[in-house]
A protein has these predicted regions:
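Membrane-embedded alpha-helical segments that form the functional core of polytopic membrane enzymes
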Residues: 37-57, 147-160
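TPR/TPR-like alpha-solenoid helical repeat scaffolds
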Residues: 264-276, 304-312, 340-364
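Alpha-helical adaptor scaffolds
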Residues: 235, 239, 258-300, 305, ...
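Structural register within alpha-helical repeat arrays
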Residues: 229-236, 272, 310-311
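Topogenic membrane-insertion module of multi-pass membrane proteins
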Residues: 1-48
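Alpha-helical repeat scaffolds
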Residues: 205-218, 243-257, 280-297, 320-334, ...
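Small-residue-rich helix-interface/hinge motifs
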Residues: 46-112
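Hydrophobic transmembrane alpha-helical segments that form the core helix bundle
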Residues: 110-201
């Protein structure tokens, strides 16, 4: 019930912000609007789409610029499914990846070291909103028209809906970081983990002592920032191929934390399909997970991990090892679509591992 009310509240806030922003901008610009030529409707629609895409780019560029100004290092820049990232040897590459549910873009950076329980997070988190507002005003002032007014309106709406704390937006991240040291440490750690992943390494595997440090954290109230820490433990055991332990941790997350944010929830659910198929192929949980519309949509994405999940399901649940091997081969051909270098390494290891299990089973039956 609280989830439904929260969703309604967020919708009302966005609607209210849009109305108020439009009303204020229209009043401020009314003298100029009177003298402007009436716009073409189709061009307005096209301008709205282009403006939305441009503001996502501008928003992420704001994070990038303010991050660089405060000592961060570039990791990746994504707009929808297009990603620019830096891998080993500072190699920059452009590629397509699966987008993150609930986000239009994302700029990830490696932060400066944490000192005295904090680090420069304010400008980095505020950079996107700041750039949206600045560019909205500049474009309108430089070339006033119905189209640039629309551009400005979309920018202001995007800025406000990111600034007002809700869901897992910039405003909420800022609010949580300002609340306490635990949240600041957790978000700092998540940024470090992402940086290591682009370098083909796991931070938690490189520094396993961090798991004990996480257990000592006094987390009074869970949120999406602290929830990330649970995935670090899962990553550690996944890297070690302790799959029963991974399965247990995923089940715990699934049943005890139903309010996980959507991207996290989808990751838990699709991973559970793979491991439950492996260990409990007759479990009703598998059908429950596969019936979820978000999971269904995600499994259609051309990702190596999806191929491994579907291969295990085909092998253990559908009892079709030959088809499973064919699916694994499909996954091997798209390893370049893994979200980062560490994921690519893990995806390849798991494709080989599952393939060896299936091949061994086939040979035993001959």
């Amino acid at each position: 019930m609280n989830k439904v009310l929260n969703g309604i509240f967020q919708f009302v806030v966005i609607l209210g912000v849009g109305f108020c922003g439009g009303y204020v901008l229209a009043n401020l610009a009314k003298d100029k609007i009177v003298s402007l030529q009436e716009p073409n409707f189709l061009l307005l629609v096209l301008a709205a789409v282009i403006s939305f895409v441009l503001h996502i780019i501008i928003h992420e560029a704001g994070h990038l610029v303010f991050g660089l100004l405060t000592g961060y290092k570039f990791v990746s820049f994504r707009v929808f499914n297009v990603l620019i990232d830096k891998e080993k040897n500072d190699k920059i590459r452009l590629r397509t990846v699966q987008g993150v549910d609930g986000t239009g873009g994302q700029c990830l950076m490696s932060p400066p070291k944490i000192k005295n329980g904090t680090f420069p997070f304010k400008l980095y988190l505020a950079g996107g909103v700041t750039f949206n507002i600045i560019f909205s005003g500049l474009v309108w002032l430089i070339a006033p028209s119905f189209y640039t007014l629309l551009f400005a309106l979309i920018g202001i709406i995007l800025a406000l809906t990111n600034a007002i704390p809700m869901g897992f937006n910039d405003g909420m991240s800022m609010k949580l970081c300002l609340q306490n040291e635990v949240n600041r440490s957790a978000i700092h750690l998540s940024l470090i983990v992402n940086y290591y992943a682009t370098q083909g390494k796991s931070y938690v595997v490189s520094y396993p002592e961090v798991l004990e440090e996480i257990k000592k954290l006094d987390i009074n109230e869970r949120n999406y920032i602290t929830d990330f820490l649970s995935f670090m433990e899962i990553e550690y055991y996944q890297d070690k191929f302790e799959l029963e332990k991974v399965h247990d941790l995923l089940l715990k997350l699934y049943y005890e934390n139903p309010d996980l944010i959507l991207p996290y929830k989808i990751e838990v659910m699709r991973s559970l399909i793979q491991l439950t198929s492996l260990f409990e192929p007759n479990s009703n949980l598998i059908d429950e997970l596969l019936a979820n519309k978000n999971v269904k949509a995600r499994l259609k994405a051309r990702e190596p991990q999806n191929k491994t999940i579907l291969a295990v399901y085909e092998w253990r649940v559908k009892n079709n090892p030959q088809k499973a091997l064919a699916i694994l081969e499909e996954g091997r051909k798209i390893l370049h679509r893994s979200p980062h270098l560490y994921a690519k390494i893990i995806d390849e290891k798991y494709i080989n591992y599952i393939e060896s299990l299936i091949t061994s089973e086939i040979e035993q039956k001959i």
